[in-house]
Amino acid sequence: MNKQTLTSVLDKYYLNGTVESVKWVIKDKTITVDFITPMKNLVGKAISPNFDLEDSEIGIYNTSQFYKLVKIMNDTVVLKLNKSERGTPLEITLADNQYDLNYYLSDLNLIETVPSINEPSSYDAEANIDSDFISKFTNAKKALGDVKQFTVKDELTDDKMKDLVIVIGEGNGYANKIKFKTPCESMFGLTEIPFPADVMMEVLKANEDATNGKIQISQEGLMKISFTEDGIDSIYYLVRLSDQ
């Protein structure tokens, strides 16, 4: 299989080291990975076709370690499972024209169960995410350094349209902040809601090459972020920060 497919799937859930332990579910050459951050502030799912591994459910306990193995491989990688006599997957092998690598799999009982998200019937605001949005957010976050939150709200424009207003920076009045806007659709309005900035930045960086991106926000404090990139669908549910 194409190494790029494998690394893209890893990027979508690993989020630069934010998520380590996951269960891979492979069926009919399609992989589905559900995941949750250790802080429980983000739940997500990555789905990719063209994943050349037999139908199975396997535990990847240390994605950092697995990623290091994948990185040294050539562009085409052959994945195979080694199983016990009872058919339990024990290890995954990776092979190219240089290396034969073995990665031992985790007991699935050691992988945290990912909860289902109770989505609202409709969201209160919706906006597209493009490369400009991603660039503005990541540049602002880098400029401000170790800020922990960003807020979103909607705002009426001069021509009676709606903008989504994103403010990156801490909540107190004396903190440095950076604000930018993007067009949005909002039926009933959206008052200011705080979300974790670090996790949002990693989500955007992991999907900076996406051809399709969308953000949907519920006033109840849930943000849904979805992307499509080269056939890979990734969905993230970000939970609001509690009021200080």
Language-model segments: residues:
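Conserved active-site/ligand-binding neighborhood in enzyme cores
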Residues: 108-113, 132-136
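DNA polymerase processivity clamps
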Residues: 1-103, 122-244
